[in-house]
Amino acid sequence: EWLDPEKEKKSAYGFGLSFDQKVHDAVTLFARYGWQDPKVYNPDITASGDLNYSLKHSWSAGLQVEGKPWRRENDVLGLAVGQVIPSQDYRRSFDPELACKDEGHLEAYYSMHINDHLSISPDFQYIWNPFGKDISDDTDDIFIYGLRTQVDF
């Protein structure tokens, strides 16, 4: 069962790990892992219409390639994949026929160094089983296209 913040005065806790390793002059691999006490979420106290998601684990892994091989030393290509894994309490709290699944994501970006003050990064993200497909069984996968801009003064 989830903690009731009106009655329980227990602390929430979790931890995260992050590893980055340069394996070549231009290639860095990374891995991330996080865990939280899944009892910190209580669907009975969330605002109406909020789409909260009680997670227990999350992980991601990927690589980053600097632009040296194609003579753009300050550019960076990044690829990542990961999952968020809901708690068992969360899985049991919804219609069992929906069979809440793990949510996954894939991301790719390319950071273009324009000059010493400006970088532009087109970004693509693909999310499957959004919210574990627990809201309705026909939840579509999500495609996100973005453009990040970094301005340094």
Predicted ranges, named:
Residues 1-19:
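Surface-exposed beta-loop-beta
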Residues 13-17, 33, 57-63, 104-108, ...:
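Hydrophobic, lipid-facing positions within transmembrane beta-strands of outer-membrane proteins
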Residues 15, 29, 33-35, 61, ...:
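Transmembrane beta-barrel strands of outer-membrane/channel proteins
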Residues 20, 64-68, 109-111, 150-152:
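Transmembrane beta-barrel domains of outer membrane proteins
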Residues 22-26, 67-78, 114-120:
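Short loop/turn motifs that connect adjacent beta-strands in outer-membrane beta-barrel proteins
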Residues 35-39, 65-67, 81-87, 126-130, ...:
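Transmembrane beta-strands of outer-membrane beta-barrel pores
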Residues 79, 139-153:
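Outer-membrane beta-barrel "beta-signal"
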